[in-house]
UniProtKB/Swiss-Prot annotation:
PROSITE patterns: MBD
UniProt protein name: Methyl-CpG-binding domain protein 3
Superkingdom assignment: Eukaryota
Composition skew (Basic and acidic residues), residue ranges: 254-267
Pfam families for this protein: MBD, MBD_C, MBDa
UniProt xrefs under InterPro entries: DNA-bd_dom_sf, MBD2/MBD3_p55-bd, MeCpG-bd_2/3_C_dom, Methyl_CpG_DNA-bd
Consequence of substituting residue 34 to A: Augments DNA binding activity, irrespective of DNA methylation
Coiled coil: 216-245
GO molecular function, one term: DNA binding
Role according to the record: Acts as a component of the histone deacetylase NuRD complex which participates in the remodeling of chromatin. Acts as transcriptional repressor and plays a role in gene silencing. Does not bind to methylated DNA by itself. Binds to a lesser degree DNA containing unmethylated CpG dinucleotides. Recruits histone deacetylases and DNA methyltransferases.
Keyword terms: Chromosome, Coiled coil, DNA-binding, Isopeptide bond, Nucleus, Phosphoprotein, Transcription, Transcription regulation, Ubl conjugation
Residue ranges of the region described as Required for interaction with MBD2: 1-80
Region (Disordered): 254-291
Length: 291
């Protein structure tokens, strides 16, 4: 096997580099690189070389395969050192807006008085405040086609929306509108007014108000409130009747289950009372019987 050694100029004087080609196997043609110290010690990897040299030489930019120093890494290292030195002079900016606490030996925290030339300045936005994640336009359309089932695995009939509620946007159906309004009621704290801008019908992608559901602007009248109150009263009445019927059925079931044990207990009590009366009855006087 052919072995050749060359002096490595990137390492201290006396170090040699050797390349050994592989003759067989899947990695035939691949060359293994070894380094030899002036004393003849063999090194097979860069970590071994770094451990042997220690702090006498910086091998962070040394390429073990080629035996050369990489200039690109050397430039980056120099820039990093220059940047660190400049940062030490200028100092790092303090992004914390909280008032500092005086470092004293007292067990109580003593705040530092803040003095400013512009006391009227106020922070318009707080970056630490949680911000709602952005959503896609017409994201409510993802809710279309979803159905609800009751405990008996039967399809729940969807409710009918009032005639005053009309959808807006491309492909907005009644199901999409119902899902959008229900989602807005549960996730938004703002009043639901619909899309107030008339230009939204011409170009919904530009003039759409993302804080409102996909419906046109609507007004709630006194007649709508009265109808809603009537519906609520009807639902409450049906609920009351259902609860009353369930309670009566429960009472009848308890009475039916308790009739047989109750009759048996009453019969046992009567037998005990008869036995006690027979025991308490006095014996007849023999003189009275003779008379």
């Amino acid at each position: 096997m052919e072995r050749k050694r060359w002096e490595c100029p990137a390492l201290p004087q006396g170090w040699e580099r050797e390349e050994v080609p592989r003759r067989s196997g899947l990695s035939a043609g691949h060359r293994d690189v070894f380094y030899y110290s002036p004393s003849g010690k063999k090194f097979r990897s860069k970590p071994q070389l770094a451990r042997y040299l220690g702090g006498s030489m910086d091998l962070s930019t040394f390429d073990f395969r080629t035996g050369k120093m990489l200039m690109s890494k050397m430039n980056k290292s120099r820039q990093r050192v220059r940047y660190d030195s400049s940062n030490q002079v200028k100092g790092k900016p303090d992004l914390n807006t909280a008032l500092p606490v005086r470092q004293t030996a007292s067990i109580f925290k003593q705040p530092v008085t803040k003095i400013t030339n512009h006391p009227s300045n106020k922070v318009k936005s707080d970056p630490q405040k949680a911000v709602d994640q952005p959503r896609q336009l017409f994201w409510e359309k993802k809710l279309s086609g979803l159905n609800a089932f009751d405990i008996a695995e039967e399809l729940v009939k969807t409710m009918d929306l009032p005639k005053g509620l009309q959808g807006v946007g491309p492909g907005c159906t009644d199901e999409t509108l119902l899902s959008a309004i229900a989602s807005a009621l549960h996730t938004s704290t703002m009043p639901i007014t619909g899309q107030l801008s008339a230009a939204v019908e011409k170009n919904p992608g530009v003039w759409l108000n993302t804080t409102q559901p996909l419906c046109k602007a609507f007004m709630v009248t006194d007649e709508d409130i009265r109808k809603q109150e009537e519906l609520v009263q009807q639902v409450r009445k049906r609920l009351e009747e259902a609860l009353m019927a369930d309670m009566l059925a429960h009472v009848e079931e308890l009475a039916r289950d308790g009739e047989a044990p109750l009759d048996k207990a009453c019969a046992e009590d009567d037998d005990e009372e008869d036995e006690e009366e027979e025991e308490e009855e006095p014996d007849p006087d023999p003189e009275m019987e003779h008379v």
